[in-house]
């Protein structure tokens, strides 16, 4: 049944791609900014947002995406090692920051420092974060909390979400007292506030690589879209949403 549903989903995506090229698979945290950038493209792009891990697995399973934009290097490496990327097209386009957030009405205060009382700050609640088993934002969170020496105190008290935007929604709805997301996610959700920013040395650099997939032609709408991502106009949009352009 699962195989049938996956094939059905891939068929639906293929239909969308044939109608509106190119098909872009992009990390969920890019949605607001990338929607605005895509509006600049003369080609009508179909953009599917989700966890980088899930999108990479879909490409591996045959989804006809022509451009992949990941929220970490690992999942781009995963596809590259399996020959699902067009050689020579990969670019590191953006950087981001990891933040600790709370519902907008929360009065919690803390500094992110070794041994900080994260477990106590949660009270009887849980820490909302993207699933650290495979979603980039969750992996960055686990790495940071391990370096701070507090991971063991909260690892059994997570509210693991399928994507960073799903974790953001948990905090916005008040379903968890604290959570971790990217700074750009917090900036577009008025129902949350940033409690603290994690120093970048606590986790691997948060870098967004983009590349053509092996199913994309060397030139055409997909290649043009990839070039648009590093244009001056796109840089201005990404900066407006809090990303750090790397080109």
Where are these predicted regions, by residue range?
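Exported/periplasmic ABC-transporter solute-binding proteins
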Residues: 20-63, 68-73, 77-247
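Cleavable N-terminal signal peptides
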Residues: 6-7, 17
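Positively charged n-region of N-terminal signal peptides that target proteins for export
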Residues: 1-4
